[in-house]
Amino acid sequence: MISYNPLWVTLIKAGKQKTDLYEITSSATVAKMSKNEPVSLRVVEQICLSLGCGVEDVIEILPDE
């Protein structure tokens, strides 16, 4: 299972909010990420480039429950 918990921590450290992601991607994509639903790697790439962070700062892989 993919978790976006690292992204929310990264945003807090950067002094940003989820709504700031709307400038990078759509509100629908942010909503999907809030529910840990899959998004494209292109979206992850755009977030990483915009925030100046690595993939590990955006997603983590967790074992299925």
Regions found by a protein language model. Give the residues of each.
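A short, Lys/Arg-rich alpha-helix, primarily the initiator
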Residues: 1-20
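Short, contiguous strand/loop micro-motifs
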Residues: 4-5, 30-34
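Residues within the helices of the helix-turn-helix
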Residues: 8, 19, 31, 45, ...
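Alpha-helical residues within the helix-turn-helix
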Residues: 12, 23, 49
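Residue-level detection of the helix-turn-helix DNA-binding "recognition helix"
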Residues: 12, 26, 35, 63
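Short alpha-helical DNA-recognition segment
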Residues: 15-31
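Short, basic-rich loop-to-helix N-cap that marks the start of a DNA-contacting helix
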Residues: 36-49
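Short C-terminal boundary/hinge segments that cap the last helix of small helical domains
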Residues: 52-65
